[in-house]
């Protein structure tokens, strides 16, 4: 039910959503707040895909792996329309990790990874928004007027111990200071010490979760947990990197 609701919300975004001037229609504006359906859809998708893959392990079970892949393609397609290729990549990554844990052949996973890279190249050539984001990230000379430039400067200004609580300036320059660039804000005010603590905390959560899942015998719990941890870890690395 949660997946169905999230899928409908994602499908209606091009008609009822807003981009807040950022070039990608990813949110619903509620006036007092905004909602990004993909954030709710990801865990629901993982649970559904895990259930399908686990059911496929029964002798008389459904073709869960194929069905879960088809569902993943639907989700990725809706995300590409926004366009939100980052979230689409996370969905495919989470599905790929679950498929690997479910016993997928390595050769097939390599082929799927190659197809994903090819799709990324096509997206780069087809989407000006996506190409601009990639070019900005890979540019050897970072433009200090971009969000990435502001964030990098904030981290440098923070040093080891930071400039002090509430003394940071980058939060006034970044529209996403409270989400995508929260680490840059924290690094400027609290320094590298806090950043290293946050990284260690994320690493501890991921390692502890994987250790627990390695001992799990229920295939559904093992697959769902692995998919959730994979997306959690990948998104943390992207936002902190």
Model-identified regions with their sequence ranges:
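Hydrophobic alpha-helical transmembrane segments of multi-pass inner membrane proteins, especially
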Residues: 1-144, 187-241
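Alpha-helical membrane-protein architecture signal
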Residues: 70, 144, 148, 161, ...
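Generic alpha-helical structural context detector
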Residues: 135-136, 153-156, 184
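Extracytoplasmic/periplasmic regions of membrane proteins
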Residues: 148-164
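Long extracytoplasmic/lumenal interhelical loops at the membrane interface
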Residues: 159-193, 213, 220
């Amino acid at each position: 039910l949660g997946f169905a609701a999230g899928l409908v919300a994602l499908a209606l975004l091009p008609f009822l959503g807003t981009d807040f001037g950022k070039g990608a229609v990813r949110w619903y504006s509620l006036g007092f707040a905004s909602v990004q359906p993909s954030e709710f859809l990801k865990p629901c998708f993982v649970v559904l895909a895990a259930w399908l893959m686990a059911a496929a392990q029964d002798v008389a079970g459904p073709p869960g792996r194929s069905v879960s892949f088809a569902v993943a393609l639907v989700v990725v397609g809706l995300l590409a329309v926004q366009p939100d290729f980052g979230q689409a990549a996370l969905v495919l990554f989470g599905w790929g990790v679950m498929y690997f844990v479910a016993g997928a052949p390595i050769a097939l996973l390599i082929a799927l990874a190659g197809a994903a890279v090819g799709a990324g190249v096509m997206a780069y050539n087809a989407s000006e928004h996506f190409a601009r984001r990639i070019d900005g990230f890979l540019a050897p000379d970072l433009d200090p007027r971009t969000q990435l430039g502001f964030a990098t400067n904030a981290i440098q200004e923070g040093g080891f111990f930071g400039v002090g609580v509430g003394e940071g300036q980058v939060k006034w320059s970044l529209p996403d200071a409270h989400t995508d660039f929260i680490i840059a804000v924290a690094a400027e005010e609290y320094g590298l010490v806090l950043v290293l603590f946050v990284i260690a905390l994320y690493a501890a959560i991921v390692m502890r979760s994987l250790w627990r899942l390695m001992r799990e015998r229920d295939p559904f719990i093992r697959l769902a947990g692995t998919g959730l941890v994979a997306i959690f870890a990948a998104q943390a690395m992207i936002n902190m990197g």
